[in-house]
Amino acid sequence: TEIDQAKIVFQGDIKETEIQAFTLDEILNRDKYKNFKIDFLDIDVEGADLKVLEGLSFEIYKPELVCVEIHEKEIKQSVIYNFLINKDYELIWSGIFSHLFKRL
């Protein structure tokens, strides 16, 4: 879980607090973001990257570039990689944990 991953990263020194969260769709559907074009989407949410991606309607917003963290050793077998491939993205750059995908 995200909490377990955070405990590893922060060596168990975390405090759990409940907050209200919104999906990207909920944020982008607000009036001031209507018809908003996303050129570059950078997601760094300490292990919750897939949840964030699942909260975006890719068919509507179509970000040109998406940067996400993938911690699995075999990138092409990760859930996030396959999620983005299925949304018509290709991997164009990989760092240690950060990976950049481009819309086809």
Language-model features: locations:
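Glycine-rich adenosyl-binding loop in Rossmann-like folds that engage adenosine-containing cofactors
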Residues: 1-22, 26, 31-33
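Conserved acidic-Pro-Pro-aromatic motif
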Residues: 27-104
